[in-house]
């Protein structure tokens, strides 16, 4: 999430221009949306709907499921107000999202692996779902669960590059080795 935010903002100081970034949450915990103060119970279609019917149905498009910069900014400011009751001033002006869209996930996504198990081409569902977004974004970052299930396999099949953030501990290193072997 930090990487997505940094890329979307760029840096005038270092001559790095901002990028249009899509941050895809493939983790059923849905922490990406939570990070931006989004109440997952109030958003429309999520990754689960896109997986379960979106690829097979022309009625649901990727843009129907994404949360844009204005929505994310509003959610962050509302979250700030909720966390700071009674403050006379409003949220800081620097709470603003630019050039960043989020494709949220929720707990319903955890059941999709069972559904995917019987489908032909199950490993390419995310790649197909994201194909329409390729020209709209400079960078697409996919946040995966810490497992080697079909959600992670879909992310790996859709990705051109893989970045593996880990904690400096034995079990994380062991898991990274398993992931590298799977790739």
Question: Predicted regions span which residues?
Answer:
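P-loop NTP-binding core
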Residues: 1-183
């Amino acid at each position: 999430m930090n990487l997505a935010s940094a890329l979307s903002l760029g840096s005038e100081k270092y001559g790095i221009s901002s990028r249009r970034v899509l941050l895809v949450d493939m983790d059923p915990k849905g922490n990406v949306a939570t990070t931006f103060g989004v109440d997952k119970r109030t958003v429309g279609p999520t990754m689960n709907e896109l997986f379960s019917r979106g690829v097979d149905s022309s009625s649901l498009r990727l843009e129907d499921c994404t949360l844009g910069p204005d929505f994310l900014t509003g959610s962050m400011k509302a979250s700030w107000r909720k966390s700071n009751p009674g403050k006379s001033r409003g949220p800081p002006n620097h709470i603003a999202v630019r050039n960043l869209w989020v494709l949220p996930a929720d707990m319903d996504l955890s059941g999709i692996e069972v559904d995917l198990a019987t489908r032909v081409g199950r490993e390419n569902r995310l790649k197909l779902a994201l194909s329409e977004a390729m020209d709209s974004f400079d960078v697409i970052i996919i946040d995966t669960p810490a497992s080697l299930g079909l959600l992670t396999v879909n992310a790996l099949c859709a990705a051109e590059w893989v970045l593996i953030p880990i904690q400096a501990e034995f079990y994380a290193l062991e898991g990274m080795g398993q992931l590298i072997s799977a790739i």
